[in-house]
């Protein structure tokens, strides 16, 4: 008789404990119910990137002096700088400049150490393509400024601010 009573008491304690755990889970679910959703509808909504976001590199051909500092500071020696020495004026003349974004790690060293500020980071991050050879940008492709997502009226922009707990 006594073992049956103790089993019944254990069953009651286990039932109470299970109900408490279910109640705790339900309270957590209810606490998240009044929060804004975290997900965005990507093609139609985009987050505004921070001002220090490291996206695609923008290149200004006229400012470049072909010093090759960008190649020396790049951890993977990525930028390809073709230049010709002008003997009459004893200066380098830039012929071609290209970066392969399929290999680039977007560290930003080239932008940081460029003495003439001809390189800058943009907010463009949509670089996907079906052919990897299309990711090799020459000076013409690097010179194009991307359209700002704030200016695009077809896309709803969402400001990504951290929540402040009060």
Curated annotation (Swiss-Prot):
Top EC class of this enzyme: translocase
Cofactor binding annotation: Binds 2 [4Fe-4S] clusters per subunit.
Binding site for [4Fe-4S] cluster 2: 74, 104, 107, 110
One GO term of the biological process aspect: photosynthesis, light reaction
UniProt domain 4Fe-4S ferredoxin-type: residue ranges: 55-84, 95-124
Matches recorded under PROSITE patterns: 4FE4S_FER_1, 4FE4S_FER_2
Protein name: NAD(P)H-quinone oxidoreductase subunit I, chloroplastic
Name of the gene this protein is made from: ndhI
């Amino acid at each position: 008789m006594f073992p049956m009573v103790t089993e019944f008491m254990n069953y009651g304690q286990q039932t109470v404990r299970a109900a408490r755990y279910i109640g705790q889970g339900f309270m957590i679910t209810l606490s998240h119910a009044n929060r804004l959703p975290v997900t965005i509808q990507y093609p139609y909504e985009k987050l505004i990137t921070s001002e220090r976001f490291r996206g695609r590199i923008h290149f200004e051909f006229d400012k470049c002096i072909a010093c090759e500092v960008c190649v020396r500071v790049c951890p993977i020696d990525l930028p390809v700088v073709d230049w010709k020495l002008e003997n009459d004026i004893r200066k380098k003349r830039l012929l071609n400049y290209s970066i392969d974004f399929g290999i680039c790690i977007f560290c930003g060293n080239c932008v940081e150490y460029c003495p003439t500020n001809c390189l800058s980071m943009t907010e463009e991050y949509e670089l996907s393509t079906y052919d990897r050879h299309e990711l090799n940008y020459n000076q013409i492709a690097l010179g194009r400024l991307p359209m700002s997502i704030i200016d695009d009226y077809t896309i709803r922009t969402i400001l990504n601010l951290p929540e402040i707990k009060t």
